Amino acid sequence: MDLLSLITGKKFEKHYSKVGSRFSDESLNGLEKQLSNGADAAIDTTADDRGSVVSLGASLPLSQGRPAKSKNILNDTLLAEDQYLVTWDGPDDPLNPRNWSHSYKWWIVIQVSVITIVVTFASSVYSSGIIDIASELHSSIPVSTLGSCTFLVGFGVGSLPFAPLSDIYGRFIIYFVTLLIFTIFQVGGGCAHNVWTLAIVRFFQGVFGSTPLANAGGTISDLFTPVQRTYVLPGFCTFPYLGPIIGPIIGDFITQSYLEWRWTFWINMIWAAAVIVFVFIFFPETHEDTILDYKAKYLRKTTGNTAYYTIHERERDPKNAMIQAATQAVSLIFTEPIVVCFTLYLTVVYIINYINFEGYPIVFAKYGFNKGEQGLSFIGVGVGIVCAGLCTPFIYWHYLKVNKKRNGVICPEDRLYPLFIGCFLLPISMFWFAWTCYPHHIHWIVPIIASAFFGFSLLIVFFVSYNYIIDSYQHMAPSALAAATLVRYSASGGISMVARPMYLNLGDHWATSVLGFISVAMVPIPFIFYRFGKSIRAWSKNAYKL
C-alpha cells in the first residue's frame, strides 16, 4: 500500500467510525449471500446485457443514493444500474460532508483558517526584515524586496495546479503534503546567505503555501449549501487578511529584538510544523468523490470483491485535468467580463494592501514610532477586517429574506448588495489616510481610523467577488478563482517592488492618493453588474443562466 492510500485510508476508516454506522460481518456476509442467490425480497434487480443488476440500497449502507457525477449522461444511466457502483446511501448518508453536524463543519473551517493564517503570515512577515537583510547580505533595499515579490508570484502560480489536484486526490493529502513542503522551505530561508537564495526559496514557499487559497473555497463548498455559504465565506475570509496583518506586527518586534531577521523564518517553521501535526490528526477528507473512492476501497478490502468502483476512479485523468484547468483558467480570464472585472477589482485591493506593508512604516516613522510600534499601526486594518466579518449575520439575514421572497430562486447579482457600500468606503478610506497623515498637525489615531475603514472595505470586496464568481460559474468556479488568484498575486508581487520608491518619491500624501484614484475607477463595477449581470451571463458560453 502506498503512503497516500495508507494515510487517507486509515483516516477514512477512523472517520467513518465516528460519523456513520460500522460495517458488520453479518451485513457483508448477508450481502454476498443475496448477490449469489438473487434474493429478490431484499434487493431489486434490473436486467441488462450481462444478466441481472442489483441495487444494494437495502443491504449495505455505503452503496446507494445520489449518483456520482459524470459528464456522460448515457454513461450515467448505465452506471446507475450497475450493482457494483458505489454512491451515497441516500440523501442522509452520514459520510456525505453536507450531512455532518454544523459544529463539526465549523471545526473543519477553523482548521483551514489556521492553515491560511500560517501561510499568509509568511507573505508579509518578510517585509519586517528587509532593511536588516540588505545590510547583512550586502544588497540594496530594492533587491532585498525581491523576496516579497517572488513569494506573491509563487502564491499565484501555485493556485493553478493545486485546485485540480485536490479534485483528483482529495483535499486532505494536498493540504498535508504542500504544508509539509512549505515548512521545509522555511529552513532554506533561515539558512540563506544571499538575497538570490532568499528570492528562490521565497518563491517556492509561495507556491506550496498557496493551497488554502486555492482549495478553501472547494472545502467550504464540500460542507455547506450556497445559502449557508453566505455567512461561512465572509467568516473564513477574515483569516487570509488577518495573516498578512499579523505578519508585520510580530515581525517588527522580532527584528527589533536580539532574535534578528532569520527568526521570522524559524518562527514560521515552528508554527507551520505544529499545524502539520494538527492537520494530520484532526483534518478529515471533505471531497465527496474522494470519499466515495475510499468507500469503494473499503468495500473491496472488506468483502474481498474487487468489482466495487466509483465513476471518479474510472474517469480520473490527472494529466488531462491539469491541462483542462490551466486552459480553462486562461480562457476565462480573457473572455469572461465577470471574471475580468472582478479579478481587476480584487487585484486593485490586493495591490493596495501589499503596498501598505511598505508604506505604513514610512508614514508612521515620521510620528516617531519605533520599529515595533510601526508594526502595531496595522491593527487598524485588522479591526476593520474583523468588523466586516461581524457584519456577516446581517448579510445572511438579508440573503435569507431575498431567498424566501423569491421562493428559493435567487440571482448571483443578489450577492452584490454589500459591495454597494464597500466600493465607496475603499476610496474614502484611502483619501482620508492620505490627507490626515500630518505628524505635526494631526494625531496618529486619525489615519489609523482611516485604515480601519480600508480593512472593512477590503474584506467586503473579497467575499462579495468570490461569492459572485462562484454563483455565476458554479462548476467552472474553481478555474475562475484560480485565474483571479494568479493575476492578483502576480500583480501584487510586481507592484510591491516599487512601493517604497513610490512613497519616497511622491510623498505620503500623493502616493496614497494615487491608490485612492485607482480605487475610484472600481466604484461602477458592482452597479454595472447588478444592472446588466443577468444579460452578461446570458451572453456568456460558460456562465450560469437563471
Curated annotation (Swiss-Prot):
Pfam families noted in UniProt: MFS_1
Ranges annotated as spanning the membrane: 106-126, 145-165, 172-192, 231-251, 263-283, 332-352, 375-395, 416-436, 444-464, 510-530
Gene3D superfamilies documented for this protein: MFS general substrate transporter like domains (1.20.1250.20)
GO cellular component entries: endoplasmic reticulum; endoplasmic reticulum membrane; plasma membrane
Origin: domain of life: Eukaryota
Entry membrane topology: Multi-pass membrane protein
Gene Ontology BP terms: transmembrane transport
Localization annotation: Endoplasmic reticulum membrane
Main location: endoplasmic reticulum
Keywords: Endoplasmic reticulum, Membrane, Transmembrane, Transmembrane helix, Transport
Annotated GO MF terms: transmembrane transporter activity
Family statement: Belongs to the major facilitator superfamily. CAR1 family.
Protein's name according to its UniProt entry: Uncharacterized transporter mfs2
Species for this entry: Schizosaccharomyces pombe (strain 972 / ATCC 24843)
Gene: mfs2
